[in-house]
């Protein structure tokens, strides 16, 4: 019984960590996107490059990231969830405003 309670508590803790990660676009960007987007176009915060991209809308950009485009492989070459991708896209767009 003690092991079952410990197991449930551990799983609950992991679940809450995943929820925080999904909601934190900056953390997702820093871990999974910045390696390329800090060095290559469109760079984070480049308003001239991101302006036209952002006009397509979040849903369209998330779909592009999931599918991949140009030099960017599907999901940026990561195993991110769609929710994490959306959070990162929203963060990147917010830095271009």
Regions found by a protein language model. Name each.
Residues 11-28, 40-51, 58:
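Electrostatic cytochrome c docking/interface patches
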Residues 5, 20-21, 33, 73, ...:
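Secondary-structure boundary/capping signal
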Residues 43-53, 63-97:
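Axial heme c-ligation environment in periplasmic c-type cytochrome domains
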Residues 1-23, 91-97:
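Post-cleavage N-terminal segment of exported redox proteins
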Residues 30-39, 88:
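The canonical Cys-X-X-Cys-His
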